[in-house]
Structure formats: C-alpha cells, structure tokens
C-alpha cells in the first residue's frame, strides 16, 4: 500500500515531518514505521524543526531508533535553535541532566522556561515540579 504520492522533484520538509509523525503514531503494518522514520530523517536533515525534535526524542529514548543520547541531543539542539517548543523542552532537559551533552542546568532551565512560554505542557509540568516543596 502506498501512502504518499510518487517521488516529488523537491520534497517539502514540513509535509514529510507531518506525514512521518502521523505514520509513526498510526502503525497499521510493519512497513509503516520504516517509512515514517525515513520521512522524519529526511525532513530533519532539511532543517524541519518538528522532525528534528521527533528524531532527537526517538534517539534520546531509543524509541523506534537506536538509543543514542548524543545524536538525540544534537537533533534536539537543532530544533531548539529554531524555537520549536518540543525541541526547547527536550534539549533543555538534556542540558539539565547531562544526557548526550555536558550538564549545564542553568542554561537547560532557560530553554525549558522558553518552551513553557511557547505553550509546551511538559515544560510547564517540569517547572511546577521544580518549584514544589520537597517532601
């Protein structure tokens, strides 16, 4: 079964990122995740911030892609540099925890604060947890 139109002369990275995300979360057969990851990787290599955040997250946690925190942090940093809320949060967390990069909690928290300001739910939750009194 084909999910996409015939090969485009110059694929649109945002289309590839969106299609990859949809296919990755709707797994009807064994070939779908491979196609999704192909689309996401291609879009990430073409500077799509959404794709970079998804590929980075997948590498960071070893979900759908090999566990590789350094590669994960790399893609998340690229996404964060473009201001993508998920990239900001996950790269900030990498910095706070030293996952795939040298620890820098102060800078990491700045990224997470920016992610929360952009509406990232996980960032808001993380900040709330950091402000909660220790039990």
Roles of regions detected by a PLM:
Residues 2-46, 50-54:
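N-terminal segments that cap or nucleate solenoid repeat domains
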Residues 11-16, 25-27, 45-48, 61-63, ...:
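Short helix-capping/linker turns of helical repeat alpha-solenoids
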């Amino acid at each position: 079964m084909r999910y996409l139109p015939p090969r485009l002369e110059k694929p649109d990275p945002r289309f590839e990122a969106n299609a990859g995300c949809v296919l990755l979360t709707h797994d009807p057969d064994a070939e779908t995740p491979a196609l999704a990851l192909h689309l996401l990787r291609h879009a990430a290599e073409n500077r799509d911030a959404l794709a970079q955040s998804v590929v980075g997250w997948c590498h960071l946690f070893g979900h759908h892609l090999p566990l590789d925190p350094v590669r994960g942090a790399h893609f998340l940093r690229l996404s964060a540099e473009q201001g993508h809320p998920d990239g900001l949060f996950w790269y900030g967390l990498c910095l706070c925890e030293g996952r795939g990069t040298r620890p820098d909690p102060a800078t990491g928290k700045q990224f997470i604060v920016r992610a929360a300001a952009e509406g990232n739910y996980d960032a808001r939750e993380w900040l709330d947890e950091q402000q909660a009194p220790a039990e």
